[in-house]
């Protein structure tokens, strides 16, 4: 073979050499759709947990993943259209949270993998046939929704034994609320307490909801897990403090002045979502990824608030707390 022909052969063959033997081509950029139920600002901590999890698995925005965000800003009716936008943008995987978010995502596609970062019982809501074998294109994480809401009543009653009229904020737009209410009514009966429910469909309803509960002699307050109420927990906690109402909600609420918090650790749920994304991007089908249940729960007591309300928290309850705020 002539020298010139040999050089041509070598140069032409280089294009077929394996990647390790060539200059690395640009890595594939996976497109991730994020369907948020409220706003980015209200879920900053959770989104950072997701990004941290992805980074630990080798995924970084601007390098090998691009995340396209859509937020419904608390308007659940916008979710289907936002989900459709993400699906149309040719994403590789769709992330969302809550039952309304999961339903909108599921209705938008039966092909693109969906990972639910946190939702109530996905089986009872009809989104999957079973936790062990979700089938279809949806998997993710769930938490003991109704049980958490009912447990809050037990805890606030333990902290405030004299409370017999327990107020509950409910967003009727969230279909998961009914199962939680059923469990809470059962628990209230066992505690010999009356449950006073008030609907909160939007942020503007919160002040009026407080006025309604205080006029009915409410002695303690909680709410049914819902993205709208969760994202406004600090505001609700501040109003509870102003109205001298012992309240139990989640961690941001306790940090903002609520007496107590009991909830699944949302940071952990969003962080764990990254592992589902990794497996799906590497070829595992959602139907082959069993749904995980929340593993971390937090009990937090704000002793500063207890003092301000003139309450003495029982020592056994303090001993069970994961965190004390004083």
Q: What residues fall within each predicted segment?
A:
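Short hydrophobic alpha-helices and adjacent helix-cap/hinge residues
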Residues: 1-326
């Amino acid at each position: 073979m002539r020298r010139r022909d040999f050089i041509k052969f070598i140069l032409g063959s280089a294009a077929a050499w394996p990647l390790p033997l060539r200059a690395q081509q640009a890595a594939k950029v996976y497109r991730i759709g994020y369907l948020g139920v409220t706003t980015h600002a209200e879920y900053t901590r959770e989104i950072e947990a997701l990004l941290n999890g992805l980074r630990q698995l080798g995924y970084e925005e601007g390098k090998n993943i691009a995340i396209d965000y859509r937020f419904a800003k608390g308007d659940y009716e916008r979710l289907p259209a936002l989900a459709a936008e993400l699906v149309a943008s040719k994403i590789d995987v769709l992330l969302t949270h809550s039952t309304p978010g999961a339903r909108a995502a599921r209705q938008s596609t039966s092909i693109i993998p969906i990972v639910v970062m946190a939702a109530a019982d996905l089986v009872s809501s009809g989104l999957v046939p079973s936790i062990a074998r979700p089938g279809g294109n949806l998997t993710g994480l769930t938490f003991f929704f109704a049980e958490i809401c009912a447990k809050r009543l037990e805890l606030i009653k333990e902290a405030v034994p004299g409370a017999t009229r327990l107020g509950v904020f409910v967003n009727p737009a969230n279909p998961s609320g009914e199962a939680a209410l059923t469990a809470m009514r059962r628990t209230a009966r066992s505690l010999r307490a009356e449950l006073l429910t008030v609907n909160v469909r939007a942020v503007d309803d919160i002040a009026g909801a407080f006025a309604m509960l205080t006029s009915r002699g409410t002695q303690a307050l909680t709410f049914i897990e819902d993205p709208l109420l969760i994202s406004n927990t600090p505001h609700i906690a501040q109003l509870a403090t102003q109205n001298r109402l012992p309240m139990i909600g989640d961690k941001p609420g306790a940090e903002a002045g609520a007496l107590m918090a009991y909830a699944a650790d949302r940071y952990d749920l969003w962080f764990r979502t990254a592992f589902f994304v990794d497996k799906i991007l590497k070829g595992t089908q959602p139907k082959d990824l069993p749904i995980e249940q929340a593993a971390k729960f937090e009990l937090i007591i704000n002793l500063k608030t207890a003092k301000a309300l003139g309450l003495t928290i029982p020592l056994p309850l303090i001993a069970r707390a994961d965190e004390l705020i004083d």
